[in-house]
């Protein structure tokens, strides 16, 4: 338990890489695995990452490009429309 109290899921790396790197990994993993909202149908918890930057909703079936660890990039707030290939 002592390894994961501060760094959470990044505790799997043990004492390797240093605590500051493992804290950054903790923050990234927390954002990646939190329940995300689908920008098309609005359902929460149905969005899954297909690969790096590719996200898909299991409810409505839409697939879109987002950021590597979150379904919407920082620029997405400026662009309301999505380009969807399907």
Curated annotation (Swiss-Prot):
Residues the record lists as binding Zn(2+): 38, 41, 57, 60
ZnF C4-type: positions: 38-60
GO biological process, one term: translation
Cofactor(s) required, per the database record: Zn(2+)
Cofactor-binding details, from the entry: Binds 1 zinc ion per subunit.
Keywords attached to this entry: Metal-binding, Ribonucleoprotein, Ribosomal protein, RNA-binding, rRNA-binding, Zinc, Zinc-finger
Pfam families attached to this UniProt entry: Ribosomal_L37ae
GO CC field: ribonucleoprotein complex; ribosome
UniProt function note: Binds to the 23S rRNA.
Family: Belongs to the eukaryotic ribosomal protein eL43 family. Putative zinc-binding subfamily.
PANTHER family linked: 60S RIBOSOMAL PROTEIN L37A, LARGE RIBOSOMAL SUBUNIT PROTEIN EL43
Subunit and interaction comment: Part of the 50S ribosomal subunit.
Protein name: Large ribosomal subunit protein eL43
Organism field: Aeropyrum pernix (strain ATCC 700893 / DSM 11879 / JCM 9820 / NBRC 100138 / K1)
Gene of this entry: rpl37ae
């Amino acid at each position: 338990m002592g390894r994961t109290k501060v760094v959470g899921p990044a505790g799997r790396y043990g004492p390797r890489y240093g605590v500051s790197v493992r804290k950054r990994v903790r923050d990234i993993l927390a954002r990646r695995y939190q329940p995300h909202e689908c920008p098309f149908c609005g359902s929460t918890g149905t969005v899954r990452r297909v690969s790096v930057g590719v996200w898909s909703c299991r409810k409505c079936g839409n697939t879109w490009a987002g950021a590597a660890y979150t379904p919407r990039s920082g620029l997405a707030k400026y662009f309301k429309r999505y380009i969807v290939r399907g």
